[in-house]
């Protein structure tokens, strides 16, 4: 499928650089078939039915952007996938400096050695410490890896803002941004409504922001991300659906993991491992009935995903409406609630 079919023009002033305060005061565009309604995130409980189940991604963003030195020169790396207790795949710039065996100094006594170098600025780093000690060093010296379209340095506010309130599993280098809208009050209102919730973990990688550089989706390579869906969670989601409830994925990351764990029989199974699932129009959904998601970049794999889920022409029209109404886009922006369209137009 041609990538340019997923292109659109977005005014730069609609790219949110800070989140709504409070989180659940953001706007929500409801898209059901051909109809659209302009609402707020706080309206979500009334849009769901008792017995529905919300599926959240509980990954926690780590300070994955590091500034270091190689000799007299500087280098910046963004970790994107843990490959061992002391090893991470990363994107680096300038990448030409990262040759196997080279040592990067991030702080006094905190270093990493280049174990391997890949393509397109990728490399594998082996740190001088592992596990909790490595996480502590990242917390001390790393920066929150804000998306490249937020054109400002990260600051202390981002340590809280770019994290869901229920994050608990260290490992993401990008936030599951639909979840940023939830507050304790909103979760309580959903519980009072009779909507249950389940947690899955997909450690979002920096590859989520990589542009699609090819002209055809068949030629695009997705980066793998590590996820876990426990047997207990699978049982809870299957039970909710069997009782007539809808499965509502909070974010594309939760959706991608759910779809990775579900077969054509629509039974969700335990999952632990990597997924590089790439969802484009024509994909047959097995796990998810509704999707809450923010507004995505043109030509991105995530805009392709929502087009596959809710219909390509419907999403083009919905995005045109959102732009005309001044919705805020991307990670810190507003959100939408989409229903699955059996007719994928």
UniProtKB/Swiss-Prot annotation:
Q: Does the keyword Cytoplasm apply?
A: yes
Q: Does the keyword Transmembrane helix apply?
A: no
Task: Quote the pathway field.
Answer: tRNA modification; tRNA-queuosine biosynthesis
Provide the reaction this enzyme catalyses.
7-aminomethyl-7-carbaguanosine(34) in tRNA + S-adenosyl-L-methionine = epoxyqueuosine(34) in tRNA + adenine + L-methionine + 2 H(+)
Q: Name one GO molecular function term.
A: S-adenosylmethionine:tRNA ribosyltransferase-isomerase activity
Highest taxon above the source species: Bacteria
Q: Report any one BP term from Gene Ontology.
A: queuosine biosynthetic process
Fetch the SUPFAM superfamilies from UniProt: QueA-like (SSF111337)
The places in or outside the cell where this protein is found are: Cytoplasm
Record's Pfam families? Queuosine_synth (PF02547)
Question: What is one GO cellular-component annotation here?
Answer: cytoplasm
What keywords are assigned to this protein? Answer: Cytoplasm, Queuosine biosynthesis, S-adenosyl-L-methionine, Transferase
- This enzyme's EC code(s): 2.4.99.17
Q: Which protein family is named in the record?
A: Belongs to the QueA family.
Give the protein's biological function.
Transfers and isomerizes the ribose moiety from AdoMet to the 7-aminomethyl group of 7-deazaguanine (preQ1-tRNA) to give epoxyqueuosine (oQ-tRNA).
Oligomer status and interactors:
Monomer.
Q: What is this protein called?
A: S-adenosylmethionine:tRNA ribosyltransferase-isomerase
């Amino acid at each position: 499928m041609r990538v340019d079919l997923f292109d659109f023009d977005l005014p730069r002033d609609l790219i949110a650089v800070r989140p709504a305060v409070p989180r659940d005061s953001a706007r929500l565009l409801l898209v059901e078939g051909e109809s659209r309604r302009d609402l707020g995130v706080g309206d979500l409980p009334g849009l769901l039915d008792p017995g529905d189940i919300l599926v959240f991604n509980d990954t926690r963003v780590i300070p994955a952007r590091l500034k270091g030195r190689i000799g007299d020169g500087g280098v910046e790396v963004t970790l994107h996938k843990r490959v061992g207790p002391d090893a991470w795949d990363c994107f680096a710039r300038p990448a030409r400096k990262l040759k196997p065996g080279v040592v990067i100094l991030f702080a006094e006594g905190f270093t990493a050695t280049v174990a391997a170098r890949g393509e397109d600025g990728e490399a594998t780093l082996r740190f001088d410490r592992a596990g909790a000690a490595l996480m502590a060093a990242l917390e001390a010296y790393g920066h929150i890896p804000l998306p490249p379209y937020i054109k400002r340095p990260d600051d202390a506010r981002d340590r809280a803002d770019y994290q869901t309130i229920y994050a608990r599993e260290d490992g993401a280098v990008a936030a599951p941004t639909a979840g940023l809208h939830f507050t304790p009050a909103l979760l309580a209102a959903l519980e009072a409504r009779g909507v249950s919730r389940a947690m899955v973990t997909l450690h979002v990688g920096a590859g989520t922001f990589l542009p699609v550089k090819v002209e055809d989706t068949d030629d695009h390579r997705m980066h793998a991300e590590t996820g876990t869906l426990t047997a207990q969670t699978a049982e809870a989601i299957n039970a909710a659906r069997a009782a007539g409830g809808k499965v509502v994925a909070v974010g594309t990351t939760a959706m991608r993991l759910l779809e990775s764990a579900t077969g054509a029989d629509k039974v969700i199974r335990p999952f632990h491992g990597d997924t590089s699932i790439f969802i484009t129009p024509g994909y047959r959904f097995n796990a998810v009935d509704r999707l809450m998601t923010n507004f995505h970049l043109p030509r991105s794999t995530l805009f392709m995903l929502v087009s596959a889920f809710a219909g390509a022409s419907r999403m083009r029209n919905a995005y045109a409406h959102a732009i005309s109404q001044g919705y805020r886009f991307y990670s810190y922006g507003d959100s939408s609630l989409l229903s699955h369209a059996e007719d994928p137009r």
